[in-house]
Amino acid sequence: YEIKVLSDGRTPLISESTYAFTADQDYAHSIAYPRLTYDYAQLRAATQTKPINLKITASRNGGSPMTVTQTWQLRQINDCPTYIRSRRLQTNGIIKNETMNVAIITLAGFVNENHPSIPRILSEALATGEIDSFSGYQEGTDISVLRQLNAIWKVLEKKGIRYSSIDTTTGSSTGVQHVRLIEDTLSTRQANCVDGSALFASIAIKIGMDAYL
């Protein structure tokens, strides 16, 4: 089998991606998961949901290719999938859809310990006088860890970040949640439980602590 995928546009979001594989047996049906060649800068810059057209070409045993055009949605960077539909091909050729909870993986993708705003936040935390340095777990005491986290908390509190429950997405779905990026949380001074947790976890990881969402 050979599969080619290409999106439209002057600068394609997905450049031509070719995937070839050999089935274990001469099956009447096969499911393929080609690795697509994305333009990651476009993905990162997407702040509005929009449609894109994909041309998919498949051929078997070097035969005449079959081409299908599909319209997909390019979701904005803030749309975080919490559930996905997994496909499993049964022996009778029927594709069975199964729902999987992936929130534990996808929400963690919004944690970014290398965000450029974090060094400034840490500097402001030191300026509070609550602590002399960020040592992570090196001092070996719970009180040391709590003092470091408390200094960070006070800086975020001083910035006036307030709770704001905005989790509805474009084409709202129960399987997708809107999550603010760190720069969005800091600039708007708004966060819900996920946004705030991602920000706080990012800072904690930066100073060498283990953080979990």
Describe the residue ranges of each PLM region:
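Long, structured stretches of catalytic cores involved in phosphate-ester chemistry, encompassing
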Residues: 191
